[in-house]
Each structure stands twice: as structure tokens, then as C-alpha cells.
Regions:
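Conserved beta-strand/loop scaffold segments within soluble protein domains that form the structured core
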Residues: 75-354, 358-361, 382, 388-404
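Short, structured coil/loop segments at alpha-helix boundaries
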Residues: 4, 8, 28, 32-36, ...
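A generic "cationic amphipathic patch" detector
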Residues: 3-25, 199, 260, 282, ...
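Residue-level detector of solvent-exposed, low-hydrophobicity positions
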Residues: 22-24, 53, 60, 69, ...
């Protein structure tokens, strides 16, 4: 049997030995069926399922669905893996779910037609409903959210998706911990185009963030996604891309890790159709005692001849105590394909600091300019001034701490 296996088709056993797989990615931590069971038993304190339809005039209509029947009729497609946290230390699964957690369940669907230019702010928690359900009485909160974006044929959309909400601040101060499970699925129909910036949640409370992004590319579809990670206590991110014939996927991102935060990123790119192109480029800065692992796999499946894939990570280390793990992998089952991968890491360039100081900048300001130069190309893609200013202020706040 071993003789029949090709080395570049085998998953590497060293992956486990390197201890970079901190999370299990085989199943969800809590399934939709379990949520439905809790609703039936009146043990789920809050559910909010919304369908949001956006037409080519950029008007948005909301329909709130709260019945069990509607939830059962709108089950999420589970053909792809979601990140789960199976190592959460609980003694009894059912008892922990029922007694220790207050559940918030949201589901949104955006359908894109024509030309769209829109900023989306997800209303995870409605304050009025929060008070009615006495969520503040619970020690812990489990928030599970589904966002399904459907780009119809020949549509051309630009979206800014901000997953931060001020409403969370009213809850965090009164609760011990939070588990946030965010699942985003983007379905690209044939000849559709999506340009998107995603600002992932930022806070400093004790908690865990599970973030899943799934891209299903149609024929001749094109998507460009910029991801912004500004730091959470424990953050686990996975993106799965399926590329069909002549699908183009361009993913770039920035991250900042600090304090004793953990960031785990997993990029899984699958070329299925012919002549697809995928590009991944990530820039990051690490300070303090933070931890980061970045894993990237590009797989060229049978039948994807003419496809190209590339993945790169560039890291600036500003602390000797920060720990980084990087593992890029290429797997090939087809001929006539091109694949490249790489990673680089380094410290602050003293020559650049000297040059900027010779132009009148202080050392602290010179460091800030160099760091922000890695982030600005992505931040400048945010068209909403309020969101952009918030992102810049958060990043600069953490950078200033390193200068003090």
C-alpha cells in the first residue's frame, strides 16, 4: 500500500509533532441540532435568525425569524469543516451547556445583485432582547453566528464587513468569559466579483474566538478579501477556498499580536477546476509574550491543470518573548500547475530607524511609521472613515505601549 502512495499526496505526520495544531477542525463545538434541542427544552435563552436581502439599489430589508420551524428549514450547509474547540475543559458537556452558558444564536443571509458598495455591521446582540432574556444573569456567554453571502451571476460588489459591535461592551463587564463562534460562507456564482474587507472582533476579555470563512468559487468568478486581526485573548481562524474553472482568489491580511494573546491561522486552498489562480499574502507584527501559528496548504487536485497558487507570510518580531510557528505546504495531484510558498521574519531595521530620525522623527515615531507601513495598504482599503479610524486607533494604542 505504501508503494502506491505519492509523497506529495500525503498529509505530513510532522504537523502533529510540531504541535502547531492547537485546535480540532473536524466538527463544530456545538451543532445547530443541539441548539434546536435546547430551544425545544426552553433552555436556549435567545435566538435571532435574520435573512437580509440586498438588491442592486443597495436597499436592505430585514426579516426576523424566531420560530423553531424556520430554524429547521434554514439549516447550514455542513459539507465543509469548521473549526471547533474540543479541548475546552468541561466536566459534563450537557450540564455545562445548560447551566453555565447563555446562548445567542444569529443567522444572516446577504444576496448580492448588480453593483453593490456597502458597509455591513452585524447586530449580534439586540439590547432590548438582551434585557428581556436576562443574559446578564449568566456567568458565560456562547455566541454563534452564521453569515451567508451569495454573489449572484454577473454581480460586482464591494463590502466592508465589521464584526465589532459596541453592544458587546455592555455584556463583557458583567460576565466571566465568552465563546464567540463566527461562520461566514461566501458563494460566488458564475462571473461574479466580490471585493471585501473583513474586520474581525477585537476585545481584551477572557474568551475564545472561533472564526471560519468558506469560499465557494463559481466559474470565472473573482474575489479579493482583506482580513484584519487586531488581537483577542484566544483567536482561531480558518479559511477554506474551493476554486473552480478560472476562479481567482486573492487573500491578503494583517495581524497584530500582543500581551499573552494567541492567534492560530489556517489557510486551506483547494484548486479543483482548470486555470484557477490563488494568492495569499499575510503581514504581521508580534510584541510582548504573544503566540502565533500560521499554517497554509495549497492543494492542486486532479483536473486543475493550468492553475497557479502562491502563499507568503511576512512577520516583524518586536519582542524576544513572542513565539511564532509557520508551516506552508504545497500538495500536488496534477501536472501543468505552478505553486510557490514562503515565509520571512525579522526584527526592526535599525538603518530605517536611523534614516527616519535623520529626517526629524523621534525614535518612537520612526518605529510607528515602519510598523504602520506594513498595515496601511490593507487599512486604506476600508472606505468607511469611522471604521478606519477605529482600526488605526486600536493598532496605534498597542504600538505606543511598546515605545513606553
Amino acid at each position: 500500500m505504501i508503494r502506491n502512495l505519492k509523497l506529495n499526496e500525503m498529509r505530513l505526520k510532522t504537523w502533529q509533532h510540531l504541535n502547531v495544531n492547537e485546535v480540532n477542525i473536524e466538527e463544530e463545538y456545538i451543532t445547530e441540532e443541539e441548539i434546536i434541542d435546547l430551544i425545544k427544552e426552553n433552555k436556549c435563552k435567545y435566538t435571532n435568525v435574520k435573512k437580509i436581502y440586498t438588491n442592486n439599489e443597495s436597499n436592505t430589508s430585514f426579516k426576523t425569524i424566531n420560530t423553531l420551524k424556520d430554524i429547521e428549514l434554514n439549516n447550514i450547509n455542513k459539507e465543509y469543516n469548521l473549526i471547533s474547540l474540543n479541548n475546552l475543559k468541561t466536566t459534563n458537556k450537557q450540564n455545562t451547556y445548560i447551566t453555565d452558558y447563555s446562548y445567542i444564536y444569529n443567522k444572516y443571509t446577504y444576496e448580492l445583485n448588480g453593483i453593490i458598495n456597502k458597509t455591513i455591521k452585524i447586530d449580534e446582540i439586540d439590547i432590548q432582547n438582551k434585557k428581556q432574556n436576562n443574559i446578564d444573569n449568566y456567568n458565560n456567554i456562547y455566541i454563534k453566528e452564521y453569515l451567508n453571502i451569495i454573489a449572484n451571476e454577473n454581480s460586482n460588489s464591494y463590502l466592508v464587513l465589521d464584526l465589532n459591535k459596541n453592544n458587546y461592551k455592555n455584556i463583557n463587564d458583567n460576565n466571566k468569559s465568552k465563546i464567540e463562534d463566527i461562520n461566514i460562507q461566501i458563494d460566488l456564482k458564475d462571473n461574479s466579483k466580490v471585493d471585501m474587507v473583513i474586520i474581525f472582533p477585537y476585545d481584551k476579555i477572557e474568551g475564545i474566538s472561533l472564526e471560519n470563512l468558506h469560499i465557494n468559487g463559481g466559474k470565472k468568478s473573482d474575489i479579493h478579501i482583506s482580513c484584519i486581526f487586531m488581537g483577542r485573548k484566544q483567536e482561531y481562524f480558518k479559511i477554506t477556498s474551493l476554486l473552480n474553472e478560472e476562479t481567482n482568489v486573492n487573500i491578503d491580511g494583517i495581524y497584530l499580536t500582543y500581551a499573552n494573546n494567541t492567534l492560530d491561522m489556517y489557510f486551506d486552498t483547494n484548486h479543483i477546476g482548470k486555470n484557477g489562480k490563488s494568492y495569499i499574502n499575510i503581514n504581521g507584527v508580534m510584541i510582548d509574550d504573544s503566540r502565533k501559528s500560521w499554517k497554509g496548504i495549497i492543494t492542486f487536485h486532479n483536473g486543475c491543470s493550468g492553475s497557479e497558487g502562491e502563499e507568503n507570510e511576512n512577520l516583524l518580531m518586536l519582542s524576544e518573548n513572542a513565539k511564532s510557528k509557520t508551516l506552508p505546504i504545497l500538495l500536488c495531484r496534477e501536472i501543468d500547475v505552478k505553486g510557490n510558498h514562503g515565509s520571512s521574519s525579522g526584527n526592526m531595521d535599525n538603518q530605517k530607524i536611523f534614516y527616519l530620525m535623520s529626517r526629524g522623527h523621534s525614535k518612537e515615531n520612526a518605529r510607528k511609521i515602519i510598523i504602520m507601513s506594513r498595515f496601511n495598504p490593507i487599512i486604506d482599503r476600508i472606505t468607511n472613515d469611522e471604521i478606519k479610524e477605529n482600526v488605526i486607533s486600536i493598532i496605534e494604542e498597542e504600538i505606543n505601549k511598546t515605545n513606553n
